[in-house]
Regions:
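Non-heme di-metal
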Residues: 1-168
């Protein structure tokens, strides 16, 4: 029989991060709508793709929970949907906090409490969250430098209408 997480700090951390990932998913879905309305189809698609990834992160966390009521105290971004540029900055900041502070700490706690699989999950998701931050910051740079729709030289891009993996120049 596996060790129970009931009553541990790891259980609270799982619920905290599950709530955070779930809320990030919804924020990114809202942000995708703003980006689309502002004419940033690619950024909208990236927000949607990342929202789907956050859903999967939340699902992995939820599967470790064992049921019942768990009381947590946590803070989350509340109710602000800005421009695409503002949303990208906010999303990057949230991703940064997850991969650089929260999840490494949660992994260490899980390890100390005897939950190596949960620790590994947090470390693996941290890698994805760092990639999310980097991608969002690249789009911030593109908007600030007005290179979203204009690049120097030839650019290879993936067509979103063609079969998967089809690239165009």
């Amino acid at each position: 029989m596996a060790k129970s997480i009931k009553g541990t700090q790891t259980e609270k951390n799982l619920l905290t991060s599950f709530a955070g990932e779930s809320q990030a998913r919804m924020r990114y879905t809202y942000f995708a709508s703003v980006a689309k309305k502002e004419g940033y189809e690619q950024i909208s698609a990236i927000f949607t793709e990342t929202a789907d990834q956050e859903k999967e992160h939340a699902k992995r966390m939820f599967k470790f929970l064992e049921g019942g009521m768990v009381e947590i105290t946590a803070s989350y971004p509340a109710g602000v949907i800005g421009t695409t540029l503002e949303n990208l900055r906010a999303a990057a900041a949230g991703e940064h906090e997850e991969w650089s502070l929260d999840y490494p700490h949660f992994a260490d706690v899980a390890e100390q409490e005897g939950f190596p699989m949960i620790a590994a999950m947090y470390r693996n998701i941290s890698i994805a969250e760092k990639g999310h931050e980097e991608r969002y910051l690249a789009f911030v740079n593109n908007i600030e430098n007005m290179t979203v729709f204009a690049k120097e030289g030839e650019v290879v891009w993936q067509c979103r209408n063609c079969e998967i993996g089809r690239a165009h120049v």
